[in-house]
Amino acid sequence: MVEHYPFKLNSEFDPQGDQPQAIEKIVKGVKEGKRHQTLLGATGTGKTFTMSNVIKEVGKPTLIIAHNKTLAGQLYSEFKEFFPENRVEYFVSYYDYYQPEAYVPSTDTFIEKDASINDEIDQLRHSATSALFERDDVIIIASVSCIYGLGNPEEYKDLVVSVRVGMEMDRSELLRKLVDVQYSRNDIDFQRGTFRVRGDVVEIFPASREEMCIRVEFFGDEIDRIREVNYLTGEVIREREHFAIFPASHFVTREEKMKIAIERIEKELEERLKELKDENKLLEAQRLEQRTNYDLEMMREMGFCSGIENYSVHLTLRPLGSTPYTLLDYFGDDWLVMIDESHVTLPQIRGMFNGDRARKQVLVDHGFRLPSAMDNRPLKFEEFEQKTNQLVYVSATPGPYEIEHTDEMIEQIIRPTGLLDPKIDVRPTKNQIDDLLSEIQERIDRDERVLVTTLTKKMSEDLTTYMKEAGIKVNYLHSEIKTLERIEIIRDLRMGTYDVVVGINLLREGIDIPEVSLVVILDADKEGFLRSNRSLIQTIGRAARNEKGEVIMYADKITDSMQYALDETQRRRDIQTAHNEKYGITPKTINKKIHDVISATVDNDETNEKQQTELPKKMTKKERQKTIENIEKEMKKAAKDLDFEKATELRDMLFELKSEG
């Protein structure tokens, strides 16, 4: 039974600027049943806050799709702060590293699937799907992986093992049910997706939980007591009357269905082998027979096999070629989709199917997979459209799809801080580097930062070297730098370790920096992807978080894209200036906290340790408790990774925190 809870928005601010009218229009549109709406929100106008207010007013389960994991992570943190009492979940691909299986016919090379699964993200995925069956105040932040195949939601829901105090059930029946939903018994290494047995006590570690296990105590053939327990310390967290244990895998199938699925796979194998032999593809036939029979044997014995998702069409007993189940099917009938940065995310959703199909076709043709493996795939764009109900697109520069499907753009141009879109100055390319250096020096003297965008890697490198020789603290952002390193460089720019960052594509995640007062666009008149009207507006927006924000474009002619960007920016400035004059608002630079890099990258440098040991003196009781929990988590992880020195340091830190409490 899905429980009802209202969305409770936690914020010290009320909607300001353009936010109230944008919220009102979107909410009205959703309530009137509008299918497509677009929020055209300029950079820095508080689009996330607007989205949060819409969710609160509409009160529907919501899926928010971002175009990469990092952006999804940022949104997840923000929405968790806005909705601490509701279920905010995170659903992205659980692979830290993923090499899909592939075959290169020209060199006769088969590349086996190789992947490293992030256990924490897997737990968050299970938490997301189980939340949708437990309550209706759910917000799931997802990457495009939400359109990839997942198990049948009905099967997932029906196979839930429900335990209740006073229920008649003997211990062995519970153990059997747990094995059916792919939990395994492990009395020694107790981890997610396992259970352990001690006399009349069964402890289960749900796949959707991080540190909490369920202790079920029996008295004869009756459940006597259910408790939530910390799996490591054994400390009882609370008593429970009832608990629902969701399957340990999304690809879970009942025994009788598994038998039918195996029969279907055998039948398909027989037909496919005949086809291959008729075409005289004997090597391919032998390869397919050997691989498929091995998988079938594993399914009979264990209930699953490696790469079981390739048989998903049979396991869910769907007709060949039918639409796969995805996260979208786990939502009920009445729900909302918000697509963040829709001008990037929608083309990504559109392109997923074709890329996946091309690779799988080669595997099928050469006998590595049955043709039905093609049905383990992401959704086609038309299927995505059919499965979604109401959509809100969010972007500073909506793409053609959003423009075509929305009758009215809901504009959010006025910033709560009164900040204007930056002034734009177009200058000739003659002596541009000397001119640029003098502009940078002016900003350094005012303790402000600069972003410079170039067109080629070589130019970025040469410019960076030249600036370093001129004594400027500069770093260079390029595509080979890992996501977390990018975030670190941005953080260092904000903190003043660097004054300038040079890069080709500065539109990627995490580049909203209030300290930046100047954005420089070199070769602005070279038409192309990086100098299209959409890219130019996005790049200009990077200077819109500082009251002294300016943009300099170096160009010898004004292209159509430049003209569009100049006109659109001026249009927005006029609206913003009129609003400020009407209400007597003075623009002021955003004051944004400098967050540490995502916790997955714990720094070990002295400053970090010093900072952490100083924390207790200036923390509230709630913050202290949260810090204790985080350090405990890191300590256990360090011990598990055999990094005992780090675990000892963290333990000492814990003692200090607890003694201060």
From Swiss-Prot:
Occurrences of domain UVR (ranges): 625-660
One Gene Ontology term, aspect cellular component: cytoplasm
Pfam families: Helicase_C (PF00271), ResIII (PF04851), UVR (PF02151), UvrB (PF12344), UvrB_inter (PF17757)
Entry-linked InterPro entries: Helicase/UvrB_N (IPR006935), Helicase_ATP-bd (IPR014001), Helicase_C-like (IPR001650), P-loop_NTPase (IPR027417), UVR_dom (IPR001943), UVR_dom_sf (IPR036876), UvrB (IPR004807), UvrB_inter (IPR041471)
Motif Beta-hairpin: where in chain: 94-117
Region annotated Disordered, chain positions: 604-625
Biological process terms in GO annotation: nucleotide-excision repair; SOS response
Domain (Helicase ATP-binding) ranges: 28-414
Molecular function, one GO term: ATP binding
Subcellular location: Cytoplasm
Predominant localisation class: cytoplasm
Domain Helicase C-terminal: 432-598
Comp. bias regions, Basic and acidic residues: 607-617
SMART domains: DEXDc, HELICc
Residues annotated to bind ATP: 41-48
Record keywords: ATP-binding, Cytoplasm, DNA damage, DNA excision, DNA repair, Excision nuclease, Nucleotide-binding, SOS response
Function: The UvrABC repair system catalyzes the recognition and processing of DNA lesions. A damage recognition complex composed of 2 UvrA and 2 UvrB subunits scans DNA for abnormalities. Upon binding of the UvrA(2)B(2) complex to a putative damaged site, the DNA wraps around one UvrB monomer. DNA wrap is dependent on ATP binding by UvrB and probably causes local melting of the DNA helix, facilitating insertion of UvrB beta-hairpin between the DNA strands. Then UvrB probes one DNA strand for the presence of a lesion.
Listed PANTHER family: UVRABC SYSTEM PROTEIN B
Domain notes: The beta-hairpin motif is involved in DNA binding.
The protein, known as: UvrABC system protein B
Organism: Staphylococcus haemolyticus (strain JCSC1435)
Gene name in the database record: uvrB
